A protein has these predicted regions:
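Short, cysteine/histidine-rich loop/knuckle motifs that typically chelate Zn2+
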Residues: 1-3, 37-38
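Short functional micro-motifs and their immediate structural scaffolds
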Residues: 2-7, 44
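Short, positively charged, Gly/Tyr-enriched micro-motifs
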Residues: 14-119, 155-159, 172, 314-315
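Glycine-rich phosphate-binding "P-loop"
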Residues: 48-55, 126-142
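Acidic/histidine-rich catalytic cores and adjacent linkers
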Residues: 92, 117-118, 122, 137, ...
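Short secondary-structure boundary/capping segments
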Residues: 124-125, 177-181, 198-203
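Structural motif
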Residues: 141-149
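Short alpha-helix plus adjacent loop in nuclease-associated cores
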Residues: 190-211
Length: 355
């Protein structure tokens, strides 16, 4: 310092820092200049609290990083820390997620989610750790192939199981990408197909009765009870306005089925299929499908043909403990992020926020 000329302090800079006692707080930072007598070089005093040529304090940057990992919009973060949205956006753009093409999880979960304007994005996740393997801008087969072919064949052969929904578009490329992997269809979608067939059948039978009649009103008002697994029906009494008396859900089912033998046939078939599926009796499940294939209506027949087409993959779903449940939970979080931000125009920002 003896070899430097000291100049006066500059005008204080207003540096935002973290709130104090709930009030916005500014740091009035004064900077002093020094000039070396030998080389004539002028320098400015520095502090670890603020980086050089920056007007945002380090605690603010660290807080922005922390809040970006939470389910908050950029605007909400900016308002909370009393900074601009562009500052938050710059920090978001600094996040990097390098890809490791030397390993893949044993169990992969595949699905898609809506990103904007009806466009679907592809997501792959580790079933066991819930770590996101990748998010692609679209769910086209070419895009998925191009990404996973970046992994050496030896690495791709380590994948033993892949869980997918029943759309059928992923099954052909899974066999190409992961030659040693078993395909497991998501159990939720299997049950959903059965449930929709039962609902469609109930509506068709219901429409054969007059609107004011008791059978029509019973099938319409108590449809949830008819859709539910009979083993999970409550034993508690409740007052049914349709029947005008206090009944248990099981008694409601019995009274409703008395109106139609056809409805009783499909209800019993539906419940038996649910039983064998949940008890992991795959042989009985498919025997029941084959025996009743030519006896059921078009709604059930379409579902049965689909199940028989994917018999191997549905058998895996029944016998193995893997499903897309964890990935669906991740998709729920993605939808929450998208809803809070009112959508993302930039897919890169959306992807970074998800990671």
């Amino acid at each position: 310092q003896e070899k430097c000329i000291k100049y006066d302090f500059q005008m204080p800079s207003k540096i935002p820092i973290l709130d104090c006692q709930g009030f916005p707080t500014l740091l009035l930072l004064k900077k002093r200049r020094f000039q070396c007598k030998s080389c004539q070089k002028v320098t400015v005093s520095e502090t670890p609290l603020v980086k050089k040529n920056c007007q945002i304090s380090q605690p603010i940057w660290e807080k922005v990083t922390q809040l970006l990992t939470e389910n908050m919009t950029n605007l909400a973060i900016a308002r909370r820390l009393h900074i601009s949205v562009s500052v938050v956006q710059r920090k978001l753009a600094q996040f990097q997620f390098p890809q490791d093409f030397t390993k893949l999880p044993k169990v992969l979960s595949w699905d898609e989610f809506s990103r904007n304007k009806g466009k679907l994005a592809f997501i792959a996740q580790d079933f066991e750790t819930r770590h996101i393997v990748t998010i692609l801008e679209n769910n086209r087969q070419a895009s998925i192939k191009n990404y996973f072919y970046k992994y050496p064949r030896v690495v791709r052969e380590t994948v033993k199981f892949v869980t997918v929904d029943m759309s059928g578009s992923y099954i052909p490329i899974i066999k190409q990408l992961f030659p040693r992997a078993k395909i497991v269809l998501d159990r939720f979608h299997i049950i959903q197909h059965l449930s929709r067939a039962m609902m469609s059948t109930r509506i068709d039978i219901m429409k054969t009765f007059d609107t004011p009649s008791l059978p029509y009103r019973a099938m319409k008002n108590h449809w949830r009870i008819l859709q539910k697994d009979s083993r999970k029906l409550s034993q508690n009494l409740f007052y049914s306005r349709t029947f005008g008396q206090t009944l248990t859900p099981k008694e409601v089912v019995q009274k409703t089925l008395e109106f139609s033998d056809q409805l009783k046939f499909y209800y019993d078939l539906y419940q038996i299929l649910l039983f064998h599926f949940q008890e992991k009796n795959s042989n009985y499940f498919f025997e029941l499908l084959e025996d009743n294939l030519n006896l059921v209506n078009p709604a059930f027949k379409t579902v049965f043909k689909t199940f028989l087409k994917y018999k191997t993959y549905i058998t895996n779903a029944i016998e193995l403990p893997y499903s897309n449940a964890k990935l669906e939970a991740t998709n729920k979080l993605i939808k929450d992020i998208k809803r809070q931000a009112f959508g993302f125009r930039n897919f890169k920002n959306f992807k970074t926020k998800i990671y």
